[in-house]
Amino acid sequence: LPPDAFMLRSLLFAAAFYAITGLMLVGLSWLLLAPRYWAMAGLKLHARIATWLLHVIVGTKMEVRGRENLPEGPVLVVAKHQSTWDTFALIPLFDDPAIILKDELKWIPFYGWFCVKFEHILVKRDKAAVALKAMVADAKDRVADGRQVLIFPEGTRTAPGAPPDYKPGYLALYDALAVPCVPVALNSGLFWPRRKFMRYPGTIVVSFLPPVPPGLPRKVAKERIESALEAESRSLIAEARMDSPTAPFSNSEK
């Protein structure tokens, strides 16, 4: 497709995505007064609509691999974070996820109110030691309720293939929660790049990797989790570029 076609599709998707997001946040605000699982159903509906719009307008599909590696019940999910896409599209893959997010998000009208309603784990980043202790305590509560705790251990979106910068918070959770830890690799940043307007056609792959059992020494757990994430992420990026060697994303992120 010519560059103008990618721009037009990206523009149409952005208009549709933000329109449906705004309409659902306001239109479903009554769910703030309903049971939490009703609100979670609304969140998953939004995610499914958004991924459908991306497929229909841009041509970006979603493929999930390794679902059998996700145990039932409480689990710690440690996922790569390359794109805004990750923050909504992963949600329907879990039964009742509690996502670790920055505390400032709760002040955003409607969106922040729903974050509180979902009992996501909101972390204040200005006081690291206090924030870490509070995060672990909140995560223990969510696990006790049978929920899945989802953390993006790099703390921010990272370009595909960029050197990783894992923060130690996920290891504190691994030690404290005593539940299986499932690494999740993906290649979303190739198709929905960070800090860029363009969206590209292709297949975003989400790969659930074999769980790391609880109770391992921290150094061993760190090596197993991070090496698995990096190896699978590199493989997914290489696979996408091999499948579409002339695609615009091939030179969009280095």
Which residues does each predicted region cover?
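Non-catalytic C-terminal accessory region of glycerolipid acyltransferases
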Residues: 3-4, 132-254
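Alpha-helical bilayer-embedded segments of polytopic membrane proteins, i.e.
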Residues: 4-25
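Membrane-helix interfacial anchor on the cytosolic side
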Residues: 58-60, 64
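Catalytic core of membrane glycerolipid acyltransferases/transacylases, capturing the structured
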Residues: 25-44, 48, 55-57, 72-128
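Generic preference for hydrophobic
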Residues: 64, 77, 99-100, 206-208
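Glycine-rich helix-loop-beta junction characteristic of Rossmann-like nucleotide cofactor-binding loops
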Residues: 66-70
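Short acidic-hydrophobic, aromatic-tinged amphipathic segments that line or gate anion-handling sites
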Residues: 64, 121-124, 214
